[in-house]
Curated annotation (Swiss-Prot):
UniProt KW keywords: Cytoplasm, DNA-binding, Transcription, Transcription regulation
Gene Ontology CC annotations of this record: cytosol
Family (UniProt): Belongs to the TACO1 family.
Protein name: Probable transcriptional regulatory protein CJJ81176_1187
TM spans (from-to): none
Lineage of producing organism: Bacteria, Pseudomonadati, Campylobacterota, Epsilonproteobacteria, Campylobacterales
Length: 235
């Protein structure tokens, strides 16, 4: 989704008591990263970033350790990454990323949320050309020389660096996630959130009234236990 709308959503979420929903989602991301790439954070950049994101959201260390331990357990749930595409009210495009041990439940819930809130689920692949997948790092504001930092990170795959009143956002091709993650750590930058995000190629502006309609769907999606992230083409 566009940066302006992203900040609006972040500000709104900060006012809600979402910890009861957030911690299980962070734990699930840690568990999946550990299962896919190993339980040693030093050898697994996705796990390092998942842990850093959890810490930035004040998730207790015991919860983090438990999530990693579950990944290596014999009885660990088979959690799958699931991807859905759809349209919200007023034609806004939506990509939904889920992690679930029960895809049948998840697809039923996602379809119901779309249909009850003025949207529809599309065939996967329908929106591929409308978005570009990027490695995106949300960091605490940087007090140093941004041009120098940009030059230092280009060799690691940096494509865009943007700082606003709230944070520093660094992005690159999705294949550069590991290299950028390591370079950011080397620079001592403070990570708030990192992952692979879908960035709209042509963001679209909507009126306040239209955004209110669209956000009803987005709120319901983000409240679902299996939904990890929601991306839109809203500017």
């Amino acid at each position: 989704m566009g940066r302006a709308f992203e900040y609006r959503r972040a500000s709104k979420e900060a006012r809600w008591d979402k910890m009861s929903k957030l911690f299980p989602k962070l734990a699930k991301a840690i568990q999946v990263a550990a299962k896919e790439g190993g339980t040693d954070p030093d050898m697994n950049p996705k796990l390092r970033s998942a842990i850093a994101t959890a810490k930035a959201n004040n998730m207790p260390k015991d919860n983090i350790d438990a999530a990693i331990k579950r990944a290596s357990g014999k009885d660990s749930a088979d959690i799958k990454n699931i991807h859905y595409e759809g349209k919200a009210a007023h034609g806004a495009l939506v990509i939904v990323e889920c992690m679930s041990d029960n895809p049948t439940r998840t697809v039923a819930n996602v379809k119901a949320i779309f249909s009850k809130n003025g949207g529809e689920v599309l065939q996967n692949g329908s929106l591929g050309f409308m978005f570009t997948r990027k490695a995106v790092f949300h960091l605490e504001k940087f007090a140093g020389d941004l041009e120098e930092l940009e030059l230092d990170l280009i060799d690691a795959g940096l494509e865009e660096l943007e700082q606003n009143e709230e944070e520093l956002v660094i992005s690159g091709d999705y294949t550069a996630f590991g290299e950028l993650s390591s370079a950011i750590e080397t620079k001592g930058l403070v990570l708030k959130k990192a992952g692979l995000e879908y960035i709209p190629n042509n963001p679209v502006s909507f009126s306040e009234e239209q955004l209110s309609d669209i956000e009803k769907l987005l709120d319901k999606l983000e409240d679902d236990d299996d939904v990890q992230a929601v991306y839109t083409n809203i500017d």
